[in-house]
UniProtKB/Swiss-Prot annotation:
This is Thrombin-like enzyme bothrombin. The keyword Disulfide bond applies. The lineage of its organism: Eukaryota, Metazoa, Chordata, Craniata, Vertebrata. One of its GO terms (molecular function) is serine-type endopeptidase activity. It catalyses: Selective cleavage of Arg-|-Xaa bond in fibrinogen, to form fibrin, and release fibrinopeptide A. The specificity of further degradation of fibrinogen varies with species origin of the enzyme. GO terms for biological process: proteolysis. The keyword Coiled coil does not apply. GO terms for cellular component: extracellular region; secretory granule. SMART domains: Tryp_SPc. Monomer.
Length: 232
């Protein structure tokens, strides 16, 4: 996260850290004791999922590591379009218990409204050159825009996405924040998918997969319908 500050250790009990290699990691969001949501483009063959984590180099007493037991990506996702249906649901190999630094966030009950102030968070780059990664998650507030702002910035926008950032630039998610949550008015509304390169450019908000539009798919999979398909 560019232009933010260290998150309060108590504000992100639902935030998980997916580690694949020193060069490749993502954010994830715990939605119940056994399931996390992230971006499909964060998928790797081998993933360690840390929950209850704040400082990467120092373990919290209640920090735990889990692995994917099952992974679900929309069966109708366009394979060669990284930004299409950029959402992945992962079942943990063992449930987690709620503790000081671990608690799920519920799925949104309403879609977010344009103009909302939203919170971003993650262990991603804190410099636009993407050469400085923090030991602790950084948090910042950004604004939810009308999708036309992103359409103009990127000559288009995938369906079922949210467009969020700061028009003057300087505050944004960045490399390593992918898959992490966009929290608007206390509700988990988005999953970081893609943004400008370099990050935090003026008039180039990032886009986030719109969780609300995928609720039927998420709820079907969790209920045991493993073949559920996503909206087109």
């Amino acid at each position: 996260v560019i232009g933010g500050d260290e998150c309060d250790i108590n504000e992100h009990p639902f935030l998980a850290f997916m580690y694949y290699s020193p060069q490749y990691f993502c954010g994830m969001t715990l939605i119940n004791q056994e399931w996390v949501l992230t971006a499909a483009h964060c998928d790797k063959t081998y993933m360690r999922i840390y929950l209850g984590i704040h400082t990467r180099s120092v373990a919290n007493d209640d920090e735990v590591i889990r692995y994917p037991k099952e992974k679900f990506i929309c069966p109708n996702k366009k394979k060669n379009v990284i930004t299409d249906k950029d959402i992945m649901l992962i079942r943990l190999n063992r449930p987690v218990k709620n503790s000081t630094h671990i608690a799920p966030i519920s799925l949104p009950s309403n879609p977010p409204s344009v103009g909302s102030v939203c919170r971003i968070m993650g262990w991603g780059a804190i410099t636009t050159s993407e050469d400085t990664y923090p030991d602790v998650p950084h948090c910042a507030n950004i604004n939810l825009f009308n999708n036309t702002v992103c359409r103009e910035a990127y000559n288009g926008l995938p369906a079922k996405t949210l467009c969020a950032g700061v028009l003057q630039g300087g505050i944004d998610t960045c490399g390593g924040d992918s898959g992490g949550p966009l929290i608007c008015n206390g509700q988990f509304q988005g999953i970081l998918s893609w943004g400008s390169d370099p990050c935090a450019e003026p008039r180039k908000p990032a886009f986030y997969t719109k969780v609300f539009d995928y609720l039927p798919w998420i709820q079907s999979i969790i209920a045991g319908n493993k073949t559920a398909t996503c909206p087109p």
